[in-house]
Amino acid sequence: MFGYSPNFTLTKIEIDMFNDDFFDDDFRDIENLVIEFHRMKKGESHGLLSEDDFEYLIDYFEANYDKENATYACEVATTLFPFSSTLLLRKAEWLMDQKKYGQALNVLDQLDEVDPNNIESIFLQSDIFLEQNRFSEAVDILERNADKFDSVDKTDILLELSEIYDELEEFDKVYTTLKRILTYEPTNEDALLRICFWAEINNKHEDSISLHQEIIEQTPFNAMAWYNLGVAYQGLKLYEKAIDAYDYCLAIDDKFEYAYRNQGDAYMQLKKYDKAIEVLEMHLSIAKPEDVILDAIGYCWDKQKQYSKARHYYRRASQLNPQDDQIFYKIGETYTKELQWEKAMKAYSIALHINKNNASYCLALGNCLMEMHADKEAMICYLNAVQLRPDIKSTWQALVKALYTISYFEEALSQLGIAEEHCGHKTEFIYNKAAILLSQGKTKEAVLQLEHALTENNKKISALKYIDNEIVHHPVFAEVLVRYKKKK
């Protein structure tokens, strides 16, 4: 219509002109500053550069990995502005980054003359000492300067100091440093959060109780202080007092997740499983589900013999952490208590599949198989158990019992001998041997072994019943037991 076709193709220069960055004031400013800087460097006529300009240039050169110009800018800046604490600090930071620690400390000495209470200089000196593994000097400079400052800066210094003590594994000093903060700033969240952990590490429960009681007197609505008080009571196994402290914490902040968690544990320690479930369910209602919480609720139902409910929570826990073999073992245990051997076997098998080196799982699986009359398969499980943990007597006892059950008496005696080689002398093995010998018809030997075991430790007679619950009623053994009681 107009006789030509418009060309909308732009050149690269034109595209750049439409780029927002092209019109960015900062970009233009730094470009001009760099030009002036290079003119100055060449000795040419140049515009005046201010303190802020030099700080901007140093940052620019550092960001662009221009070590030569960053170093030159630092030198010129501190020559032109020798009393600028900002530029002296920036130069020291640059020198530290270049690992020129001695030069950096010299610059900080100059800064100390200009601005003796510059907190950033104190932190930087400490950092330099730490880089050189001069830990005592890092601690000393922070300790010497902490009381020079008001609460906020003082707190920053003491928090830094506590971290250094942590690195040095001087854990008692970590606790005392955090305590110093709370004596003048009882609501400091960082210190309150950290001191709870360090009170436990240093077994400072009683001191922590006194400290937090004082804090609560000053700030009664301090939820974190009530929580820490509860943790301290719990550390001393004063569970009722811990529960009361958590109640106050939750009255102030009903979204305090760890208070629910710890209170639930305190109720569990007191075997108040209903209350524990109630509290842990509250935790689930306000927080993202966690396998440890679901596992704990399952445990509480388990203890109340509500096995179906226990399994429900164990399974929910396993969905969040499918590689936790112990959860599947616990599921198997609930089925075992209900004598549901096949289901128990499946749960134990999953646990063993995840953790093939757990002797307890092999034993549990073997016990299920024995109950299901799968004797040979059970024997394999027991043999695996003793191979995994030959130092535990219970694995050998399970194997011996299985051999006894299927009337492999000689093999059972042989395994008892091997068990003693690995575990040493055990009274339980003597009781086991007595039962086996009696079943072989070796009455005199059996009686001698039983009498020996009773003399050695009569309280372990359950080992005899473990092998064969009815054997204590055998006339021969019954007579020995009656005679032994009369002697007593």
What does each model-found stretch correspond to?
Residues 80, 113-115, 148-150, 184, ...:
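Structural marker of alpha-solenoid helical repeat scaffolds
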